[in-house]
Amino acid sequence: MNPPPPPSSGHWFESDPLWFKKAVFYEIHLRGFFDGNADGSGDFRGLTEKLDYLEWLGIDCIWLLPMYASPLRDGGYDIADYYQVHPDYGTIDDVKTFIEASHERGLRVIADLVMNHTSSDHPWFQRARQAPAGSAERDWYVWSDTNQKYEEARIIFTDTESSNWTWDDVAGAYYWHRFFSHQPDLNFDNRDVQEGMLDVLRFWLDLGLDGFRLDAVPYLFEREGTNSENLPETHDFLKRV
């Protein structure tokens, strides 16, 4: 799944498929960068205004931290809608304008994307928890009648989480989460989930993004008798990306 190259500007990386190995990246948290509409939050309009400065720095690629619609309980890594940006940061049209202006300057743009889990506010999870057990909607997440499965998987946030399972009263079942309990893991054993995530990638690549830093990908699959990290199934899926 390769994005189209940005318009030619004479940059060395335009003919190099491994451009990212030598590129200078500039990581940006939109909220703290530059406020383009004086509402107290950095945004895409402000970032676009500062592109001449970023070009002057001599960077090759802008790396955006999560900018998607989110309740922001984990800095935007809890995504509630993969197809929208957080309203504090602007609109999809603002993103398109920013990407086009970046490409005009020979700058590439990548973004963090969380594939392993969503926010518990995501419509996918809300549908799943309300759907009957065994239904296609329920199967988008990892559920269990017991919290004793996958016990060899470590708890990552031991200061806040006592288990990788959390009981959901609406579903009447436990759901799996490798991170915070408000970030349920998607079920990548479900082919529909895989295709849904590939659709997300296509959407942003079609919008003009040049790539992604895929967050939390070691944890996409779970298997008994393993630590459920970096499994062969994960590598097989990533080959499709």
Where are these regions (language model features)?
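Acidic/aromatic-lined carbohydrate-recognition and catalytic surfaces
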Residues: 2-190, 194-198, 206, 217-241
